[in-house]
Curated annotation (Swiss-Prot):
It comes from the Bacteria. Pfam families: PALP (PF00291). It is an enzyme of class 4 (lyase). Its cofactor is pyridoxal 5'-phosphate. Pathway: Amino-acid biosynthesis; L-threonine biosynthesis; L-threonine from L-aspartate: step 5/5. GO terms for molecular function: pyridoxal phosphate binding; threonine synthase activity. It comes from Bacillus subtilis (strain 168). The modification N6-(pyridoxal phosphate)lysine is found at residue 59. One of its GO terms (biological process) is threonine biosynthetic process. This is Threonine synthase. GO terms for cellular component: cytoplasm.
C-alpha cells in the first residue's frame, strides 16, 4: 500500500526520526502513454499526470516535505506567495499538520478552482494589487523577520520533495526517457526533476534525459534573459516574470544538453484542447506548455523522431474551469423536454 513520499523515498530525502510522517498520499501518479499523438508525431510520448495528486498539482510533492520540516523545526505557521497551486497545497498540508497558513496572491490573477481550495483548507488569504513576483518579495522579507516558515520553491525542502517525480518516471519506464519536457514558471520543478534524475541514475544506472523546459511567451524571462515586470499569459500557473530558481533551471538545461524555450498562448491552448480531445487527458493550461513545446520541437527537429519523451502535466484541468468554458466552441444545446426532439438531434449529431 502506498504511504506517501516521505515513507516511500526516505533514503533519498533529508528526513530524520523527528520528521513527522506527514502525508495525504501524494505521489505515485500515473504515467500515461499517448498512442495517437505518438503515432502522429513519430515519437513515444507519455505524460506524467501530476493533476491526480491530493490537491490536484505537483506542488504536493514539495509541500509535504516543506511543511513536515517546518513542523519538525518547531514552526506553527507557514507562508507563501502563489499564483494558485502553491496556496492550495500549502493550505492543505498545513491543515493536515495542524498549522496556520498565510498566502499572498495577485488580486484577480488566480484561477477560481485554486482560490476555492485555499479558502476551503482554511488559509488566511491576502490579495495584493501587484503580481506574483511582488508577492514573493514581500513573503521572503516577512519570513526573514518573523518565526514563520517560507514554503515557496526557494525553500530547499520543496525541491527535495519534487525530485521524487523523476524517481517515479524512471521506475515506470524502467529507465529515464530521452527527453523530459516540462513547463517553467518559477523554475523550481525543472531544477527538482534534474536533481532527481541524477540521484536516481547514480544509484540505479537509469540514464539521464535532456531537460526541455517551456516558458509562456508573455513570461519568458529566462529565454529573453531579462526580468519581465508585468508578465501576461493565459497560463496563470506560469505567469512569473522573475523565476526564483532561474540559475538552477539554466544549469539543468545546460548540463543535460537540453534547452529552455518559449511557447505562445495560442500554442498552449492548442495543446490544451488537443490532449483532451484526442487522448482524453484534461490538464490545466499552464501544464500544457510542455505538450506545446514537444509539438514545436518535434516540428523543428530539435526532438528527433523515435525519441522517448515524457511531458509533465503539472496540474489538473479542473483547476481552471473558466478557461475551458471560455475557449470551447462546444456549447450546450437547449432542446424541449421531449424525447422525440432529443432523439432527432442525437441522430444528427451521431450521424446515425
Amino acid at each position: 500500500m502506498w504511504k506517501g513520499l516521505i515513507h516511500q523515498y526516505k533514503e533519498f530525502l533529508p528526513v530524520t526520526d523527528q520528521t513527522p510522517a506527514l502525508t495525504l498520499h501524494e505521489g505515485n501518479t500515473p504515467l500515461i502513454h499517448l498512442p495517437k499523438l505518438s503515432e502522429q508525431l513519430g515519437i513515444e510520448l507519455h505524460v506524467k499526470t501530476e493533476g491526480v495528486n491530493p490537491t490536484g498539482s505537483f506542488k504536493d510533492r514539495g509541500m509535504v516535505m516543506a511543511v513536515a520540516k517546518a513542523k519538525e523545526e518547531g514552526n506553527d505557521t507557514i507562508m507563501c506567495a502563489s499564483t494558485g497551486n502553491t496556496s492550495a497545497a500549502a493550505a492543505a498540508y498545513a491543515a493536515r499538520a495542524n498549522m496556520k497558513c498565510i498566502v499572498i496572491i495577485p488580486n484577480g490573477k488566480i484561477a477560481f478552482g485554486k482560490l476555492a481550495q485555499a479558502v476551503m483548507y482554511g488559509a488566511e488569504i491576502i490579495a495584493i494589487d501587484g503580481n506574483f513576483d511582488d508577492a514573493l518579495k514581500i513573503v521572503r522579507s516577512i519570513c526573514e523577520k518573523s518565526p514563520i516558515a517560507l514554503v515557496n520553491s526557494v525553500n530547499p525542502y520543496r525541491i527535495e520533495g519534487q525530485k521524487t517525480a523523476a524517481f517515479e518516471v524512471c521506475e515506470q519506464l524502467g529507465e529515464a526517457p530521452d527527453v523530459l519536457a516540462i513547463p517553467v514558471g518559477n523554475a523550481g520543478n525543472i531544477t527538482a526533476y534534474w536533481k532527481g534524475f541524477k540521484e536516481y541514475h547514480e544509484k540505479n544506472g537509469t540514464g539521464l534525459p535532456k531537460m526541455r523546459g517551456f516558458e509562456a511567451e508573455g513570461a519568458a524571462a529566462i529565454v529573453r534573459n531579462e526580468v519581465i515586470e508585468n508578465p501576461e499569459t493565459i497560463a496563470t500557473a506560469i505567469r512569473i516574470g522573475n523565476p526564483a530558481s532561474w540559475d538552477k533551471a539554466v544549469k539543468a538545461a545546460e548540463e543535460s544538453n537540453g534547452k529552455i524555450d518559449e511557447v505562445t498562448d495560442d500554442e498552449i491552448l492548442h495543446a490544451y484542447q488537443l490532449i483532451a480531445r484526442v487522448e482524453g487527458v484534461f490538464a490545466e493550461p499552464g501544464s500544457c506548455a510542455s505538450i506545446a513545446g514537444v509539438l514545436k520541437q518535434v516540428k523543428s527537429g530539435e526532438i528527433p523522431k523515435g525519441s522517448k519523451v515524457v511531458a509533465v502535466l503539472t496540474g489538473n484541468g479542473l483547476k481552471d474551469p473558466n478557461t475551458a468554458v471560455d475557449i470551447s466552441e462546444i456549447k450546450p444545446v437547449t432542446l424541449p423536454t421531449d424525447e422525440d426532439s432529443i432523439l432527432e438531434y442525437v441522430k444528427g449529431a451521431a450521424r446515425v
